[in-house]
């Protein structure tokens, strides 16, 4: 069925009024500006800043989704590439939520105090694109291939999964609590995993790790790119390991 995933988030799509608040968020009156303050840089939509087009924004993504649902827009390679630009940072949700909190009485709580969940809309579009045969961008496919082949995003050996474990610690593979380490903490920022393991150990918590049986969660790289089937394979393995 066309737009199968978009239909599930239809309410989010039609709650977007295309007000543009998602692009830069609220004004900070304490920041210098010749008029009335400046926008918070940590709230700015990164793809909108890059392209300077409304298409590349939260409201733009919702407008695309609405057009797809209503049959006013057809999926093309250019459209897929544009939607893949969204990194799902969530700035738009935060910015939108502040607006609806202010005017909650006017909107009769239609948003229940939160903004339009545009990242969920974008995930749905990406998943529908993949189902229709439109592949993700080359960079996404490269990472997905590395995960499928070696079960981690960095194309590292699974035998290195235990390399972060401090030499003075012995961590079992069975315990009451599972510490899922993840690719980044395993291969790049091992001090994070080491520190957390020491905290658990100091607290006397009976924990375990999957070690070489741990696979990439696939969350950011697969699920956020619409590669739902491959993501589910990774998740199922980790649950059953």
What are these regions, as identified by a protein language model?
Residues 10, 55-241:
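Iron-sulfur-cluster electron-transfer modules
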Residues 42-44, 176-177:
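A common structural microfeature
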Residues 1-21, 29-34, 39, 53, ...:
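Ferredoxin-like iron-sulfur electron-transfer modules
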Residues 19-33, 95-104:
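Short regulatory "switch" loops immediately downstream of catalytic or recognition motifs
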Residues 18-24, 47, 88, 98, ...:
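Disulfide-rich extracellular modules and peptides
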Residues 43-57:
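Short amphipathic helix-turn modules centered on a small-residue break
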């Amino acid at each position: 069925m066309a737009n199968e995933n978009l239909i599930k988030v239809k309410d989010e799509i039609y709650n977007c009024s295309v007000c543009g608040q998602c692009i830069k968020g609220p004004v900070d009156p304490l920041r210098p500006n010749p008029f009335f303050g400046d926008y918070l840089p940590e709230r700015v939509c990164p793809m909108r800043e890059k392209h300077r087009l409304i298409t590349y924004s939260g409201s733009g993504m919702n407008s695309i989704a609405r057009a797809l649902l209503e049959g006013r827009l057809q999926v093309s390679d250019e459209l897929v590439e544009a939607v893949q630009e969204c990194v799902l940072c969530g700035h738009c949700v935060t910015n939108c939520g502040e607006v609806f909190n202010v005017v909650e009485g006017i909107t009769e709580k239609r948003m229940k105090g939160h903004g339009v969940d545009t990242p969920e809309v974008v995930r749905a579009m990406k998943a529908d694109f993949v189902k229709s045969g439109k592949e993700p961008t080359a960079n996404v496919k490269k990472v997905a291939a590395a995960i499928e082949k070696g079960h981690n995003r960095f194309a590292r050996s699974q035998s290195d999964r235990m390399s972060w474990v401090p030499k003075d610690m012995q961590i079992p593979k069975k315990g009451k609590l599972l510490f899922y380490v993840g690719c980044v903490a395993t291969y790049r920022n091992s001090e994070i995993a080491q520190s957390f393991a020491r905290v658990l150990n100091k607290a006397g918590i009976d924990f375990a790790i999957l070690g070489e049986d741990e696979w990439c969660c696939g969350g950011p790289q697969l699920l956020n790119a619409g590669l739902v089937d491959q993501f589910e394979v990774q998740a199922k393995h980790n649950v059953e390991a």
